Amino acid sequence: RVLHKSSLPIEVTQEIFDRAHKSGNYVQTYKTVDIVTKRHTKELDYYVERSHMTYKLTRRISDCLDSEPQKVILIHLEDDGKLKRFQKANAAWAKGKCNSFFSCKEYLEYCPVDTDKGTGAQYLVKLLNIPHTSTVAIGDEQNDIPMIQSAHIGIAMKNGIDDIKKA
């Protein structure tokens, strides 16, 4: 059951795709239960193998989507620096349009503005009427930082990235 849904405008999704392709990065989004992307690559194979999802290839992403997606993911399997450079180069454009973070070193995700694990956790706390003092969050990656910061008790996994250990 979906408790709350936020989505990226299709124009923003298309722009992320255009910018990713210009920079030579693989990028994908989702239509219901399918991955939607422009080309078949090793990154797509990697993701399909782990997610067991089906995929659709299309020339123009906005032509394939009949509703706004919840996220867009750029994937690079060999050089996470390339994704970091992309994120930095597009930060000014993305400001106020979407939120970006790494869910692992290979995945740079773009989601609706003000949408992250922290806002999701806060939504649940309010919906379920849980006292803030009863909240605990555990994480290991960059995308977990807002959740850990929003909880009363935040725990970083031993194998977590350095930034989460500082949060």
Question: Where is each model-derived feature located?
Answer:
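Conserved acidic, metal-coordinating active-site core of Asp-based
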Residues: 13-15, 19, 23-138, 147, ...
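Asp-based, Mg2+/Mn2+-dependent phosphohydrolase catalytic module
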Residues: 150, 155-167
